[in-house]
A protein has these predicted regions:
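Hydrophobic, conserved cores of late-appearing folded domains
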Residues: 75-89, 108-113
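A glycine-rich, hydrophobic loop/mini-helix early in the fold
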Residues: 90, 95-112
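A contiguous, surface-oriented mixed alpha/beta subdomain in the mid-to-C-terminal portion of proteins
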Residues: 2-61, 68-70, 79, 84, ...
Length: 331
């Protein structure tokens, strides 16, 4: 059975890799010079024996190239800077190392729900020299908050990128910040291949263009990753657009007054794993009130309910009836 599972995973990797090639091809079927770059993030590292570790990449044949993207917040740790791995270049016929493309896809799929974040963040097509793209990214990673204050944001991480794509303001900013990029492909939490098409080619990045709502979504990402980990451990399939669904659940937890991290995570787990309306059942509402009043944790209050009530809460949710109990979620 284990061999069959590994074979199925390999088949999925190859299918997604082929889908990526087909997604990229319309941008490459031109006489204009085009590069295809994979973005690696050593801040979410891989083991030294991993074939995508830079020490292993240096041993590949044919030789491959990569360029660092300077991070002002990691000046003393250049080994953590993002790397732009060149997969295709105008002066080469076809892919420089086609198995390497397959390897990046397999890695992105395997790490998509990791609590530690993605190492392979995406693939971009550009008509600009990779060194120019690295300089653009360096500038765009620093967000101006005020005249004197800047904040770094690793917006290229797939989870963060997916949230930015849900914001019209953020999409407009990224189109400006990444002028010269025609396409950005990434794999989301559910394992789906996505593509962002860029239009407009303004020259200078727009500093500080993200709204307060965009920043709030980004600040919830660490909690969202804990929700993803718990859902994965509970063997719950992540829905399409999981990044947005989880963020909306965490935001709703804020609105309802849930302060403790444990309560917020419990609320989000039920919202995604059972259904977004679960908290509207009177018994669920009472449990939430117990948590906000400090009488008990949300998980303990829910676990005190009988099976029939839990079943009715699941029906209220309108999604997956009776999938998991609170204890199973939080184990």
């Amino acid at each position: 059975m284990e061999d069959m599972s590994e074979a199925a995973e390999m088949g999925e990797h190859l299918a997604v890799a082929q889908a990526l090639r087909e997604q990229l091809w319309p941008h490459l079927d031109t006489d204009a010079p085009r590069w295809v770059l994979a973005l690696l993030d050593p801040n979410h590292p891989v083991a030294v024996h991993d074939p995508l570790h830079v020490t292993r990449l240096a041993q590949r044949q044919p030789p491959v190239e990569w360029l660092p993207v300077r991070r002002e917040d990691f000046l003393s740790s250049p080994e953590l800077w993002p790397q732009l791995l060149v997969l295709r270049a105008p002066d080469r016929s076809g892919w420089i190392d086609e198995p390497l493309l397959d390897l990046t896809v397999a890695h992105a799929l395997e790490r998509r729900t990791s609590i530690n974040g993605a190492y392979v963040c995406g693939w971009l097509v550009t008509d600009r020299d990779p060194a120019d793209i690295a300089r653009q990214m360096k500038r765009a990673l620093q967000q101006r908050m005020s005249f004197l204050q800047q904040r770094a944001l690793a917006w290229f991480e797939p989870h963060r990128w997916a949230l930015l794509m849900a914001s019209e303001d953020a999409r407009a900013w990224l189109r400006t910040a990444m002028a010269g990029v025609h396409s950005w492909s990434w794999i989301d939490l559910a394992g789906h291949l996505n593509e962002t098409l860029f239009t407009g080619h303004n020259e200078a990045p727009v500093a500080g263009a993200l709204t307060s709502a965009d920043w709030a979504r980004q600040q919830r990402v660490p909690q969202a990753r804990q929700v993803v980990l718990a859902l994965t451990k509970a063997d719950i399939d992540l829905p399409a657009d999981a990044e947005r669904h989880i963020d909306q659940a965490l935001l709703q937890a804020d609105v309802l007054g849930l302060i403790l991290l444990e309560d917020r995570l419990c609320f989000a787990l039920h919202s995604v794993g059972i259904g977004p309306q679960w908290h509207r059942h009177p018994a669920a509402t009472a449990c939430i009130e117990c948590a906000t009043n400090g009488e008990s944790t949300l998980a303990d209050a829910l676990d005190a309910l009988d099976d029939e009530t839990l079943h009715r809460i699941a029906i209220t949710a309108g999604e997956h009836v009776g999938t998991k109990t609170s204890k199973e979620f939080m184990a």
